[in-house]
């Protein structure tokens, strides 16, 4: 027969064995984190807005009026809720002209706002007087529409519309190749303002690099 002391020792031994087994079991079922189970953020899974140039438009041919600047008021370049990607003035052999232009798609643009450059002399129809007009949508904005208008006081201005972006835009300054300045609208046919397919125009201005040449300075912007 076991004494009471021996019984107590046996109970403690059995209880110790049970505790050890319980600890070993639970330790083996704990999942430790490792590199293969941790999901790291990946740029490829983050959707960023982008522009894509995929719509070609034109303003339709209309009389170029012997090259007088005021005849540009017949042409309205309008991309509606998208940004303008490029534009150039085109002449035909019948004394007509039109603007060809591309509209972007995509992006994260909204809040259309109306702007103008303010009236200034039309210079008797000389194209170089357009250098007094700076079409500028400002930072984080895209140009969506513009047209030249005139009043009854021999003055011109650009009306234009801008779209603000919900995401920051990164811009670069561009300049067209200078072309000969004769004072006629036909001078603009050498001035091709064109951004990459993932960019939009945010500003442009006619300049005179020399007394007998013109060029456009403009900005191309993207996400």
Task: Name each region found by the language model.
Residues 1-6, 26-57, 63:
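Compositionally biased low-complexity segments enriched in polar/charged residues
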Residues 47-223:
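Lectin-type carbohydrate-recognition ectodomains
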Residues 3-27:
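Single-pass alpha-helical membrane anchors
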Residues 23, 30-31, 38, 69, ...:
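Short linear motifs centered on Gly/Pro in flexible linkers and helix caps
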């Amino acid at each position: 027969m076991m004494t009471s002391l021996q019984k107590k020792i046996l109970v403690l031994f059995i209880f110790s064995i049970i505790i050890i087994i319980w600890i070993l079991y639970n330790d083996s079922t704990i999942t430790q984190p490792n590199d293969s189970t941790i999901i790291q953020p990946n740029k490829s899974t983050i959707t960023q807005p982008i522009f894509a140039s995929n719509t070609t438009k034109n303003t339709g041919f209309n009389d170029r009026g012997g090259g007088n600047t005021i005849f540009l008021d017949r042409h309205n370049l309008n991309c509606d809720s998208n940004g303008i990607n490029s534009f150039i003035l085109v002449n035909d052999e019948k004394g007509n002209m039109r603007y060809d232009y591309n509209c972007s798609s995509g992006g994260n643009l909204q809040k259309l706002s109306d702007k103008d450059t303010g009236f200034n002399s039309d210079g008797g129809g000389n194209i170089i007087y357009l250098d007094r007009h700076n079409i500028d949508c400002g930072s984080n904005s895209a140009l969506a529409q513009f047209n030249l208008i005139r009043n009854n006081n021999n003055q011109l201005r650009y009306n234009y519309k801008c779209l603000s972006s919900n995401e920051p835009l990164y811009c670069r300054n561009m300049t067209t190749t200078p072309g000969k300045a004769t004072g006629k609208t036909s001078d603009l046919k050498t001035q091709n303002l064109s951004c990459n397919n993932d960019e939009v125009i945010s500003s442009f201005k006619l300049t005179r690099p020399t007394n007998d040449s013109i060029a456009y300075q403009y900005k191309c912007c993207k996400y």
